[in-house]
Amino acid sequence: MQKKFHNSYLAHFLLFNFFFLAYSLFSTLISVYMQDLGYSNAQVSMVVSASFFASMLAQPIFGVLSDALGIKKVFLFSFLAMMVGAVFFMKATQLWQLLVWYSLVLMLVNGVNPVMDVLAAQSPYTYGKIRIWGTIGYALGSQLAGLIYQRVAPQAIFPVFIGMMLISSIGLLGIQPKHDRA
């Protein structure tokens, strides 16, 4: 079974669909979530802006790390750190905590995001057949975030994010990027 999963379409589907679904879950309703915690629009804007700034700084670093250490190693560490960051974000109540943990998670997500396209291009399948699952996952994540927020609880989004990242990690384990360091 493991040999059939190695570089399979299923492995790529799991990686792309659930990574982007998780990304959407985590980020889609951040402003609503923070406003429900009592933060002003300016405070929400500060948290979101800080995350984009951290992401901008991280992207070139992720490229260098992926080249030096290997995509899979960098991704596995990043996925684990995203899940840990989500736990801390879920428990955060102070503005500085929300800023730090949201920025960390989004920095990691946006750091690996461009390298995801490398994985899609290197897969044994056409780029579009792999990348479409990221688009579908993101769209599903936006809708799912709203449903979870409204029907379960706002903080329930974060354990679901962690679950989706675990599924994405299973997909990552089934992929062997070309020219990756072992």
Residue ranges, per PLM feature:
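Helix-loop boundary and gating motifs at the non-cytosolic
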Residues: Q2-F52
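Residue-level signature of mid-helix packing/kink "hotspots" within the transmembrane helices
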Residues: F52-P60, Y138-A139, Q143
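Helix-to-loop junctions at the C-terminal end of transmembrane segments
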Residues: L57-G70, Y149
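Intracellular juxtamembrane helix-capping segments at the cytosolic ends
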Residues: V109-P124
